[in-house]
Swiss-Prot record:
GO molecular function, one term: flavin adenine dinucleotide binding
Domain of life, per lineage: Bacteria
Top-level taxonomy: Bacteria, Pseudomonadati, Pseudomonadota, Alphaproteobacteria, Hyphomicrobiales
Enzyme nomenclature, EC number: 1.8.1.4
InterPro entries: Class-I_Pyr_Nuc-Dis_Oxidored (IPR050151), FAD/NAD-bd_sf (IPR036188), FAD/NAD-binding_dom (IPR023753), FAD/NAD-linked_Rdtase_dimer_sf (IPR016156), Lipoamide_DH (IPR006258), Pyr_nuc-diS_OxRdtase (IPR001100), Pyr_nucl-diS_OxRdtase_dimer (IPR004099), Pyr_OxRdtase_I_AS (IPR012999)
Protein name: Dihydrolipoyl dehydrogenase
Amino acid sequence: MAESYDVIIIGSGPGGYVAAIRASQLGLKTAIVEREHMGGICLNWGCIPTKALLRSAEVLDHANHFKDFGLVLEGSVKPDAKAVVGRSRAVSARLNAGVGFLMKKNKIDIIWGEAKLTKPGEIVVGKSSKPVVEPQHPLPKNVKGEGTYTAKHIIIATGARPRALPGIEPDGKLIWTYFEALKPDALPKSLIVMGSGAIGIEFASFYRSMGVDVTVVEVMPTIMPVEDAEITAIARKQLEKRGLKIFTSAKVTKVEKGAGSITAHVETSDGKVQQITADRMISAVGVQGNIENLGLEALGVKTDRGCVVADGYGKTNVAGIYAIGDVAGPPMLAHKAEHEGVVCVEKIAGLPNVHPTDKGKVPGCTYCNPQVASVGLTEAKAKELGRDIRVGRFSFAANGKAIALGEDQGMVKVIFDKKTGELLGAHMVGAEVTELIQGFVVAMNLETTEEELMHTIFPHPTVSETMKEAVLDAYGRVLNA
């Protein structure tokens, strides 16, 4: 007889494991199915290990500027690729084990294998086709295995994987995805990065800090295309100052593989083609949802462009089947997945006043140097929607703390509705702006007006004062510029 649960979640990434914990907290008998690593891509091969790599890059960048701070370094500092990667993998392993601990603590059953929906309320779990690839990421103890399981509610949280362009498919040797880029045996001397979204530009920034000659090729007119164009123009200037070569409105039309190198044919907006040769290429042209082999078609679950169609509560068109996180479509961000997981489970549990996920208030963060962070509408999008707006800006170059830190290259930009004073969007570039953006996220979520922001006391000296000054600037009241 099949073991029965209230909720079964397929996938243990940020959306899946957080949904499982919240379900258990609400008294629902819960199981989670995983075929590879607890914590999903984010924890094992994405958000967390890349931040560890970028921290090593940041420390190295600081060391190379000791003289600017009156410090004398005897000798030189150089990266040890093996040690840098080793630290990153150790950070990931620690958190991987932490997810297993949280499952045990919250009395959540772990089912190991690949799940397939056979009918509403039932899954069959078979052997995983993706075995654990690192000894520091062992299987949790006392997991359940292959078999049939039933549940009143089944949540699909299977995440996403790299998208590949025809003829330029990653081979794990010369053409990498994030997987190979995270754990190189040695640093290449030169690198082509195809795509300048968060994944592409973060790896470009990391490898440049490590001393690698990096070329970025982006098909759109600006890097980080989802971000505000004024902000990304500042970021591009700083990245190029660090030595990155960036092509926008350009595309890789074909590649030629050699013995230990790869040549990309890059077509620019004027129709000309350049040949760029490098040791390695990273393909970072987007991701697509993991919807295959789940039995969705047989059950009539709607999909669109490689993702499951779900509403703000995670409901699909088939009763009892839900989807959250990357597999449910953009923005494909871990924190959106976590929030969707909580919302979905609270709705299942029948809690009152559960609000659907508002994708317009999901912040985005890119951890390159300089960092970029945002929430809400860009200036271009606000105008496209016909909003009458006020725009405020404030430069880090006029902020005392930023100058003291030696981090005066940055800006905060805010967009308000001229009639209502509603904060429509906030955009930042500069050191640690990924830690600042949450202030505007809270303000937007609470529907804070411009007057309330202008009358909020910000501590001095802090870089966060740039946020208030940007708001003041939108209304002609800026104090320090």
